[in-house]
């Protein structure tokens, strides 16, 4: 099949490229065929992934538009209505389209006992873990505006919380960029203390992987534009 596709593609290489414009164009015949073939490979009657995506749902606003202090929209899930309200077009892989639909489920979810997530408020999820000493936040989204909104949603159901620590899993911006949306400088624990001492101080420890600062700098220099 790969050879057949390649041969057919060569005869259609100019099918939709006669005029290079930003306007939407129909899928080529080969693209349609490849995407249609996905229906023969995967069981689209299996809705388990959709059920998983909705499992544990607690609450969400009817519409999700997050703005900054100046009223500028920084995150708008309404922009993805075209995915939720339509079947996969012939220009898209139907499995990826279905996966994208699942990703439009936003709000507060319970993952398991004492573990919650705010989903769809940014590129990544914000996870809350209840401990004996307070709450741990795992990853704090890409911007302070989205992180603040996610924390407010969580508090609307769980009440005011003491954040004992923020864990940043890795050096991509959507996992650390929103730190100022969940913490102020005055709330930070003294990083020169041991972790136990930071927790005992009543302030919030920030826990990152070894080499985090170097990874942040190097990844943004080499891959920041592409990402």
Task: Set out the residue ranges of the language-model regions.
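Charged, low-complexity, helix-prone segments enriched in Lys/Glu/Asp/Gln
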Residues: 31, 96-104, 151, 212-227
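N-terminal pre-domain segments of enzymes
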Residues: 8-100, 104
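C-terminal segment of classical bacterial N-terminal signal peptides
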Residues: 1-5
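Acidic/polar short surface loop at catalytic or gating sites that assists cofactor/ion binding
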Residues: 70-90, 202, 210-227
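Active-site metal-binding motif and surrounding structural segment of the metallo-beta-lactamase
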Residues: 133-134, 144-207
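Conserved beta-strand hairpin/beta-sheet module of binuclear metal-dependent hydrolase folds
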Residues: 101-161
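Internal hydrophobic scaffold segments of catalytic domains
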Residues: 8, 18-30, 179-222
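Solvent-exposed loop/turn segments at secondary-structure junctions
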Residues: 122-125, 142-145, 170-175, 212-215
């Amino acid at each position: 099949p790969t050879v057949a596709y390649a041969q057919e593609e060569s005869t259609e290489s100019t099918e939709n490229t006669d005029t290079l414009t930003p306007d939407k164009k129909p899928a080529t015949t080969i693209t349609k065929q490849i995407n249609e073939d996905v229906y023969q490979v995967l069981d689209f009657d299996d809705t388990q992934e959709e059920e998983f995506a909705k499992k544990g749902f607690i609450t969400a606003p009817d519409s999700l538009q997050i703005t900054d202090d100046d009223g500028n929209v920084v995150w708008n899930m309404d922009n993805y209505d075209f995915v939720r309200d339509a079947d996969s077009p012939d220009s898209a892989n139907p499995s990826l389209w279905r996966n994208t639909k699942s990703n439009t489920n936003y709000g507060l979810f319970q993952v398991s006992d004492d573990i919650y997530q705010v989903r769809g408020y940014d590129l990544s999820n914000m996870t809350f873990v209840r401990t004996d000493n307070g709450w741990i936040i795992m990853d704090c989204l890409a911007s302070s505006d989205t992180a603040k909104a996610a924390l407010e949603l969580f508090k609307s159901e769980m009440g005011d919380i003491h954040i004992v620590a923020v864990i940043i899993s890795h050096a991509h911006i959507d996992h650390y960029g929103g730190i100022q949306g969940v913490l102020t400088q005055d709330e930070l624990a003294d990083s020169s203390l041991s972790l136990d001492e930071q927790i005992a101080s009543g302030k919030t420890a920030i826990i990152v992987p070894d080499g985090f600062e170097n990874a942040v700098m190097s990844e943004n220099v080499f891959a920041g534009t592409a990402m």
